[in-house]
Design a protein with these regions (language model features):
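Amphipathic alpha-helical "coupling" segments that flank catalytic cores
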Residues: 1-241
Length: 241
């Protein structure tokens, strides 16, 4: 309510001033949700607070109120994660994967990856992802090639293509079925365990096939793989040493 009121009349914190302690108020909301393991529909709450102010006759002149307040809360979430020594690129990647209504999920996902990124699980995830992403980026760069994120199993030439598609579908099914009680370590472990199938594909399949249809189909497969990883957390934004 306080945040909506001040943002509504454009009394937002600046880089040097925060006379109404709005940063502290926003950080309090973040801490309340995370430390009590709660999710809340922040967008609905902002909309409700706006309607309360207007019903009481307050003039809210800021037309970008909701968007600016959401950005402000996510910035405070980033600050909170920095306090917890979560890498900034991991924090941003997690934020980019979800909206403000999933603050607790954003934090837990980032925290878990931050703890595992330099361990074998993290190394396996990124070696698999980068190998696929690098080939995909190289083939799509400055070329007239449009992919549809679907692949045609009918023109697969070997078992390695079939196995990769099967693994992608297994991962997608897992992520579709997880709920708010997600085991974040298990989720990352599942991604890491895909390395064997992914590397077998690259070791035995020539993506840049002479047949353009087969080549495109294999690139579609790689795009599906990368999007499956990115739908969990935006791995493309994370730096690897």
């Amino acid at each position: 309510d306080t945040l909506v009121g001040f943002f509504g009349i454009n009394q937002k914190p600046t880089s040097s001033k925060d006379p109404y302690a709005l940063r502290r108020s926003a950080l309090g909301i973040i801490r309340l949700l995370i430390e009590n393991n709660k999710e809340f529909k922040i967008k609905d709450l902002i909309t409700y607070a706006i309607s309360l102010h207007r019903n009481q006759g307050f003039e809210l002149s800021n037309e970008s109120l909701q968007e600016e307040l959401i950005d402000f809360l996510l910035d405070r979430l980033k600050y909170y994660m920095k306090e917890k020594e979560i890498r900034i690129d991991i924090a941003e990647a997690s934020i980019n994967s979800f909206g403000v209504d999933h603050i607790n999920k954003i934090y837990k996902k980032a925290l878990t990856l931050n703890n595992l990124i330099n361990k074998q699980v993290g190394k396996d995830i990124f070696s698999s992802y980068k190998r696929a992403a690098n080939i995909l980026d190289s083939e799509l760069k400055d070329k007239q090639l449009e992919l549809s994120n679907t692949t045609d199993p009918g023109i697969f030439k070997n078992e390695f293509e079939k196995n990769l598609l099967k693994k992608i579908n297994e991962l997608r099914k897992y992520f579709t079925n997880i709920n708010r009680d997600e085991n974040y370590i298990q989720s990352l472990t599942n991604l890491a365990n895909a390395k064997k199938v992914i590397f077998e594909f690259f070791d035995n399949v020539k993506v840049n096939d002479e047949d353009k249809n087969i080549k495109k189909n294999r690139l579609e497969l790689l795009q599906m793989l990368c999007k499956t990883f990115d739908n969990y957390i935006n791995f493309s934004n994370i730096e690897i040493n």
